[in-house]
């Protein structure tokens, strides 16, 4: 990613921005459960801690940085992050990341439409959160911040251990995560 003299991110032309299910994977997503879970270092270290601008046509991503610092490129803006930080990237938004090698945290990629369908039934006002890109540097020890990691760990367990009802449980946990994101958005001033 290149930065102009005024601090704005300079993106390549729209037709050159790659589309991925997961960054760097050219094959279509093969997940039968509609979501993926990764620790940030798993993929970022393979790319020297820089994830170039790209987008996901049908997937949203939630990144929670629990340790370290970095920058998020979201559409045409670049945002500084320091842990704890949360980034929500709805489907169709160009994004990229630069991390320091001491970063840790999680990334969940999920099919946006099924998540929106579930939200539409259980909490229609959650749709705005699901469709709004955001970068938030979070307060340490805040009650909503503290509620994030247990949800991410539950999502990880569900993703790593296939079982009957995995899609239902996964979407339910992702919906609970999005409720926490909405609460954080209501109590904090997001960067985006």
Regions found by a protein language model. Give the residues of each.
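A hydrophobic/aromatic-rich effector-binding and dimerization subdomain
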Residues: 2-34, 98-160, 178, 183-187
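Hydrophobic/aromatic-rich alpha-helical bundle segments in the mid-to-C-terminal region
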Residues: 49, 188-191
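Structural motif
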Residues: 69-71, 78, 94, 104, ...
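Short acidic-glycine-tyrosine-enriched beta hairpin
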Residues: 76-90
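Generic protein-terminus/edge-of-domain signal
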Residues: 1-73, 77-79
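Short beta-strand His + acidic residue motifs that chelate non-heme Fe in jelly-roll/DSBH
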Residues: 71-73, 89, 95-101, 107
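A short, Lys/Arg-enriched amphipathic alpha-helix from helix-turn-helix/homeodomain DNA-binding modules
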Residues: 146-149, 171, 191-192
